């Protein structure tokens, strides 16, 4: 059984009702537990929800990190209001939020480093924890390194202070 089956991108050449109808049929057959989408706007999620007759839309996998916060304007609030989990891909901004200072040489990197030092955590852990502090947001950081996997897992189970969140929000505005 597939736990979560997602549409990766909206496909305007195939009606969303047809696609989601087929996905709901897979749920009915016991082959899939939950249906989600990826890279859908709020309007596309509304259309998807209207097309679904038997199952809720449970997730939207989207680009989200400290550097790319545009979805906070409408998508995150909509998902929170509709019990849809946001699955943040590229939460470390291709490594630039993981302590690679050459990729983040401005004051933002200094703020991230300061918060990491204050917290006794790595910059990557701070960046991931910041994402996790948002409503209905989980992260899927990419790595092929066992040590980084452990480090990423240690981004949960603790919280940034409200002052630290404010510092990060100011350094990385929407």
Model regions and ranges:
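Specific alpha-helical transmembrane segments that line the substrate/conduction pathway
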Residues: 4-9
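A glycine-rich helix->loop->beta "capping" turn
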Residues: 1-3, 36
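Beta/alpha (TIM)-barrel catalytic core signal, keyed to glycine-rich beta->alpha loops juxtaposed to Asp/Glu
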Residues: 10-174
């Amino acid at each position: 059984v597939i736990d979560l089956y997602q549409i990766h991108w909206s496909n305007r050449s195939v009606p969303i009702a047809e696609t989601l109808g087929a996905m709901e049929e897979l749920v009915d057959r016991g082959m899939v537990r939950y249906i989600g989408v990826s890279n859908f706007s709020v309007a596309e999620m509304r259309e998807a929800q209207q097309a679904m007759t038997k199952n809720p839309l449970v997730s939207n996998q989207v680009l989200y990190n400290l550097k790319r916060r545009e979805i906070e304007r409408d998508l995150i609030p909509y998902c929170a209001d509709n019990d849809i989990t946001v699955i943040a891909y590229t939460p470390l901004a291709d490594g630039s939020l993981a302590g690679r200072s050459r990729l983040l040489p401005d004051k933002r990197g200094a703020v991230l480093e300061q918060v990491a030092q204050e917290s006794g955590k790595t910059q990557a852990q701070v960046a991931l924890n910041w994402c996790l502090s948002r409503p209905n947001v989980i992260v899927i950081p990419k790595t092929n390194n066992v040590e980084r996997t452990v480090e990423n897992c240690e981004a949960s189970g603790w919280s940034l202070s409200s002052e630290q969140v404010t510092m990060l929000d100011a350094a990385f505005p929407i």
